[in-house]
Each structure stands twice: as C-alpha cells, then as structure tokens.
Amino acid sequence: MFGDRQRPMVLVLGLGESGLAIARWCARHGCRLRVADTRETPPNLAALTAAGVDFEFVGGAFSPALVDGGIELVALSPGLSPLAEDLAPLVAAARERGIPVWGELEFFAQALAALGANGYAPKVIAITGTNGKTTTTSLAGLLCERAGKKVAVAGNISPAMLDKLTEAIDAAALPDVWVLELSSFQLDTAHTFAPDAATILNITQDHLDWHGGFAAYAAAKGRVFGPRTVRVLNRDDAEVMRFAPPAAAADAPRAVTFGLNEPAADGDYGLLRENGIAWLVEAIDRDGADAPAAPSRRRKQEAANPPDIALKRLMPADALRIRGLHNAANALAAYALARAIGLPAAPLLHGLREYRGEPHRVEVIATLDGVDYVDDSKGTNVGATVAALDGLAQRAVLIAGGDGKGQDFEPLAAPVARWCRAVMLIGRDAPALREALADTGVPLADHATLEAAVRAASALAQPGDAVLLSPACASLDMFRNYAHRADVFRSAVEDIALEKGTTL
C-alpha cells in the first residue's frame, strides 16, 4: 500500500481536496500523520478533525524542518509546485534523505497494486491534456457505463481518487473500470501509475509557472503512459505525437491516433467529409487477419506491404449533441479509449449520441435574434480559446481577458483574424491581448466589466454569429472562479433576453 513501508509516518503538504483525501487514506491504514499548510486554519482542517483522524498540524510557511522527526513519506497536494520558493528547499531535503515524494495519484496506483494482490483487476483509463479533459473523461465514463460496466469517474474532475476508492471499498462495490481525469500537477508526482489505456488530448502553453517551463509541462503530461499502456494520441498535435512509440521498437506499446482528418492507419480514428456530411470514422485494414498481429510484427508487415485501408462510418458528427470540431475530436478520443479496453462498439455509439456536454465548456446558453450566446468560461488558456473559435467555425464576437498566467497570446491572432467580427477585452491582461491582436485587422474594445462587454458584443453581433465568452485567461483578477465568471455572463445575457421580451 505504501511501497516497501507498512505504516509510514507521512507528511501531508497542503490540505485541499486532494490533501484531505490523502490524509484520510493514510490514517485509515494506520499511518502517523503530520499535516502542514501555509494557512493557519485551512478550510478542511475541521473536516479532518471531525473524521476522528489523529494528526499533528503545522500552519504557516513551509520549511525543511517539517521532514524532521521520523518522516518516511511526503505527500504533495497538486496545487503546490515543488519549484515554489517556499517548497523547493523542503522537497530537496526530503530527496537528500531518500524520502519519497508522492502525490495522490501515486497513492492510488499503490492502492490498486495492493488490491490486485487479492484479485482485483479493473481496467483503468486515464485522460490528460491542456484542454478537453473533463468533457472526454465524462464522456468516456458514460460510454463504459453504456457498455454495461460498473464505472468510477474521479481525479481532477472530482471527487478525489482516494475518496472514491474508499467509498467503493466500504460499499463492497469496486468498479470494473476507473476513468480518471489527470492534470499535469497530479501526474508530476506519479511514479508507478500504469493505466490500461490513456490519452493526451493536446499540449499547449499552460501552468508554465508551476512547472518551470513548457518542456517540463509536456513531460509531466507524458507520465500518463505506463510501459504497456495503449496510447491514444491526437495526430493533429505535434507535441502529443512526440509520445508515439518508435516504429522499430520490438516491445513498443500499442498506439492509435485520432484527428480531424481522414485516418490512414489501421485502427485509427478521424473525420470523413463526404457530400457535405462529416462522419466519425475508423480506419480498417481490408486485408487484416481476424486475429491481429502483435504491434511490432504488424508494423513490420505494414512497412513491407502497406495496408489497404477502408473507412468505416461510425456516425455523422452532427449527431453529437456537443458543439464544435474540437468536441468531435474529444468524442473520438473517448470512443478510442473505450475500444482500447475491449468494449463493444454498438453501445458506445449510442452513448456518443446521448452525451450533452459539461457546463461552461462551449455551452450555448441562449439564441436571441439568431445570435448564439456561448459560455466557454472554462477556456482559461490560449489553446482552449483557439479550439472554441475553430470548433464553432462561425463568425463571432469574442470576449477575452483576465489573468493570463504568463502565456504567449500570439497563437490567438490567426483564429481571431479568421472568425472574429470584433473582440471585447476585459481584465488585467487586456493590454497584452490587445498587443497580440493588434495586427489582425479585427476591431478591439476595452471594457471595465464583463457585463459591459456582453452588451457591446450583443450590439455588434449579426444573425448567425456567436457572442463567445472564451477568456483564454484565469478568472481570479475579477471573479471568485471560472463558474462565477460564467454566472455573470449568463446574468448579462438574461438581462438582454428580458429586454427582447423573452427568457432563457
């Protein structure tokens, strides 16, 4: 359960949702606990006390002295960067003493290994990427359920993995399939995690301050793959395709790709555009044997004799209830993951048609006088906003801005020039956005509030357009969180609807 340690003394750093779950899990298994948080009274302190857990609490600045006194294992909450000025010396001190540093995902992986010794062998699906994780995770969970499996969905999507596992153990209802949404923070401190199938949906700039740079951020995403994990890769993303196994490697894991073009290799997924209809398709080798060769042997055969590929139509893309080409890609990824663990196609396709999407993720909240009002408040980075604009593929008045987290806004310029009638700028980093978009030829307007930006956008939008809130930025400079930002947007749209004599 804890590597080669039976009941170690554990230092839990940070008492957020994940830290609380780790503390409860460790206490459940007889560990001695020291819990530290930079806040003197973190919100979850009362919850941990109420759970009857015996622990020592240390509030205030982190210091290397926290690993003194017999600490054998350090548990790091995902919100805490090991590179942070107050934390780096502590992490260094732990490693100098040979004390492992784990995150919740590593505790979860160790727990599954321990349960596996008693015969528990679930399938594990993992989803990461800069954008699209929650949609793909929720959809993959639904697909597995529709295939008749008992499914647990957890991770970055909430609830915490260890809380979900505890609940399942106590209910004597361990799932057949785990579907996990994983952030780069969670993956950074994983060491033995090895899911059956995993995807990296995309990799664009985000959380660079936490990881110390783009290379480290991308490397953290790559930790989602174990040595035998089926790799489901976005072939439209060059950074993702760096994780494709080498073709010549005899022991290379199986890999399949998805993308918005026609797939060219057996088992890959994509889109076929024919007679004005876009189809979700799977590439099938017409000459393939009923029993497929091992991956390395198959690659050698394909090199000698290129396969005769046919495209099997799965369903029209328009039959998906989630909007945008980026969501077609997410649907293909979820389907590929479910197929990778051996689930039958028919119930999965029914699930794809059923899924309605997640709130605040390219969610059409109203159509007024022919104008769509689209809430993409969860679009907190440049890649998300690029995906929203390209995915909607319609003329838009974009509302963007907030806390840019040190991102480069230049990649927004091309899709803004292609799709935007105008851009309404809000928030702290509006000047940086203005500079990045200055040469697009698209009108730019600054607004002190989101409400003012929505009104101005509504006045400019034409029938067939979208008023798109996709900020490309975090929200904390103006709002409590992205959901609060979405609520303000919705309220402003409701006011406009009332003035037009209707309601949402």
Swiss-Prot record:
SUPFAM superfamilies: MurCD N-terminal domain, MurD-like peptide ligases, catalytic domain, MurD-like peptide ligases, peptide-binding domain
Membrane among keywords: no
Enzyme class, first EC level, given as a word: ligase
Binding site for ATP: 129-135
ATP-binding is among the record's keywords: yes
Catalysed reactions, semicolon-separated: UDP-N-acetyl-alpha-D-muramoyl-L-alanine + D-glutamate + ATP = UDP-N-acetyl-alpha-D-muramoyl-L-alanyl-D-glutamate + ADP + phosphate + H(+)
Annotated keywords: ATP-binding, Cell cycle, Cell division, Cell shape, Cell wall biogenesis/degradation, Cytoplasm, Ligase, Nucleotide-binding, Peptidoglycan synthesis
Record localization: Cytoplasm
Record-linked InterPro entries: Mur-like_cat_sf, Mur_ligase_C, Mur_ligase_C_dom_sf, Mur_ligase_cen, MurD
Alphabetical list of Pfam families matching this protein: Mur_ligase_C, Mur_ligase_M, MurD-like_N
One record GO biological process: cell wall organization
GO MF annotations, alphabetized: ATP binding; UDP-N-acetylmuramoylalanine-D-glutamate ligase activity
Metabolic or biological pathway, per its Swiss-Prot or TrEMBL entry: Cell wall biogenesis; peptidoglycan biosynthesis
Top-level taxon: Bacteria
Chief location bin: cytoplasm
GO cellular component: cytoplasm
EC number(s) given by UniProt: 6.3.2.9
Similarity field: Belongs to the MurCDEF family.
HAMAP family: MurD (MF_00639)
Function: Cell wall formation. Catalyzes the addition of glutamate to the nucleotide precursor UDP-N-acetylmuramoyl-L-alanine (UMA).
PANTHER family xrefs: UDP-N-ACETYLMURAMOYLALANINE--D-GLUTAMATE LIGASE
Designated name of the protein: UDP-N-acetylmuramoylalanine--D-glutamate ligase
